[in-house]
UniProtKB/Swiss-Prot annotation:
It comes from Bacillus subtilis (strain 168). Involved in the type II fatty acid elongation cycle. Catalyzes the elongation of a wide range of acyl-ACP by the addition of two carbons from malonyl-ACP to an acyl acceptor. Can efficiently catalyze the conversion of palmitoleoyl-ACP (cis-hexadec-9-enoyl-ACP) to cis-vaccenoyl-ACP (cis-octadec-11-enoyl-ACP), an essential step in the thermal regulation of fatty acid composition. It catalyses: a fatty acyl-[ACP] + malonyl-[ACP] + H(+) = a 3-oxoacyl-[ACP] + holo-[ACP] + CO2; (9Z)-hexadecenoyl-[ACP] + malonyl-[ACP] + H(+) = 3-oxo-(11Z)-octadecenoyl-[ACP] + holo-[ACP] + CO2. CDD domains: KAS_I_II (cd00834). The gene is fabF. Pathway: Lipid metabolism; fatty acid biosynthesis. Keywords: Acyltransferase, Fatty acid biosynthesis, Fatty acid metabolism, Lipid biosynthesis, Lipid metabolism, Transferase. The keyword Acyltransferase applies. One of its GO terms (molecular function) is 3-oxoacyl-[acyl-carrier-protein] synthase activity. It holds the Pfam family ketoacyl-synt. Belongs to the thiolase-like superfamily. Beta-ketoacyl-ACP synthases family. GO terms for cellular component: cytosol. This is 3-oxoacyl-[acyl-carrier-protein] synthase 2.
Length: 413
């Protein structure tokens, strides 16, 4: 069976770099950091002092207050970004096409803020005072459910939860839905709102977060002095569309998605497999799925979390897959500016990968001040680079040994 071609026709984002795609992208290519002092929780209680928060976001600017109160923050972000993406795609979801329009949006954690607040009510006021909206606000699939309701999309409706690989897995899974003919359009990506007391406590306890108090330099992927990731929030949603469907309605096309790889480490609950073996296989699977040679990849948007082992092993994985070509590749981590959006990271980074192809600009890795001999690739330090790109690869790796890779291509008719 001939695989259907799948293109990207819409983008929507809420990120620490901006409350829309254009602002987020322009800040990324200008090396602007979206990281600042923690305001959502009392920083005095935690070793980590900085976070990548949304700025000046008021959900009532985007939806009715009554509806917003029925959603956890992660769902609010997803619905807002999805509406942006569909509007950008100029897609009118009529009753006729609704059964062929699906939603596949994931969250690595779900409604942790709701869980914390309702558990406090449970403890202090008793079980009868817990909100009837507690469960439907908390569960991770509710972002997809609320997007489906908001858009009137009645096709495939699913949710992936693979920790920090969630956004990338979601897009890859949605890509395959269209490729095999089960939908014409998929609204897909990732969302996360993890800036809560328990989340900071948990990630601090396992030593994952940077304790650098300087917001400008705390997230420093591939730098010798990196000491952990900076937690962030937001949503990145894209519209995937079967090519003929997009052409028939005259849609603008940002680029094409051509490859997806997904593997498991079977190694450790939080640490990546030694030498990046699982990540290497995910990249190899995606390259095979795309039907291209490794040497055709021009740029890698790395997972690049600013943790010691991730950056070391991802570098090793890239060398395993690409051999000599690894040193000719441009590799950058936009997490140096956005922080780590966990389940939303893959969605935002897919958008940056797509725009890198469309605009011919590679966003930089900022804060590489002290080179690490174990991280010796071209990480596009400090300044964006103009370069024609035909194929871009994006990696996401998650707790539990989840590895996911997407490959995007410059669209050619």
């Amino acid at each position: 069976m001939t695989k259907k071609r799948v293109v990207v026709t819409g983008l929507g984002a809420l990120s620490p770099l901006g409350n829309d795609v254009d602002t987020s992208w322009n800040n990324a290519i200008n090396g602007v950091s979206g990281i600042g002092p923690i305001t959502r929780v009392d920083a005095e209680e935690y070793p980590a002092k900085v976070a990548a928060e949304l700025k000046d976001f008021n959900v009532e600017d985007y939806m009715d207050k009554k509806e917003a109160r029925k959603m956890d923050r992660f769902t609010q972000y997803a619905v807002v970004a999805a509406k942006m993406a569909v509007e950008d795609a100029d897609l009118n979801i009529t009753d006729e096409i609704a059964p062929r329009v699906g939603v596949w949006v994931g969250s690595g954690i779900g409604g942790l803020e709701t869980l914390e607040s309702q558990f406090e009510i449970f403890l202090t006021k008793g079980p009868r005072r817990v909100s009837p909206f507690f469960v439907p606000m908390m569960i991770p699939d509710m972002a997809t459910g609320q997007i489906s309701i908001a858009l009137g999309a009645k096709g495939v409706n699913s949710c992936t939860v693979t920790a920090c690989a969630t956004g990338t897995n979601s897009i890859g899974d949605a890509f395959k839905v269209i490729q095999r003919g089960d939908a014409d359009v998929m609204v897909t990506g990732g969302t996360e709102a993890p800036l809560t007391r328990m989340s900071f406590a948990g990630f601090s306890a396992n030593k994952a977060l940077s304790t650098n108090p300087d917001p400008k330099t705390a997230s420093r992927p591939f730098d010798k002095n990196r000491d952990g990731f900076v937690m962030g929030e937001g949503a990145g949603i894209i519209v995937l569309e079967e090519l003929e469907h997009a052409l028939a309605r005259g849609a603008k096309i940002y680029g094409e998605i051509v490859g997806y790889g997904s593997t498991g480490d079977a190694y450790h609950i939080t640490a990546p497999a030694q030498d990046g073996e699982g990540g290497a296989r995910a990249m190899q699977e995606a390259i095979k799925d795309a039907g291209i040679a490794p040497e055709e990849i021009d740029y890698i948007n790395a997972h690049g979390t600013s943790t010691y082992y991730n950056d070391k092993y991802e570098t090793m994985a890239i060398k395993t897959v690409f051999g000599e070509h690894a040193h000719k590749l441009a590799v950058s981590s936009t997490k140096s500016m956005t922080g780590h959006l966990l389940g939303a990271a893959g969605g935002i980074e897919a958008i940056f990968s797509i725009l890198a192809i469309k605009e011919g600009v590679i966003p930089p890795t900022i804060n590489i001040q002290t080179p690490d001999e174990e991280c010796d690739l071209d990480y596009v330090p400090d300044e964006a680079r103009r370069q024609e790109l035909n194929y871009v690869l994006s990696n996401s790796l998650g707790f539990g040994g989840h590895n996911a890779t997407l490959i995007f291509k410059k669209y050619q008719s």
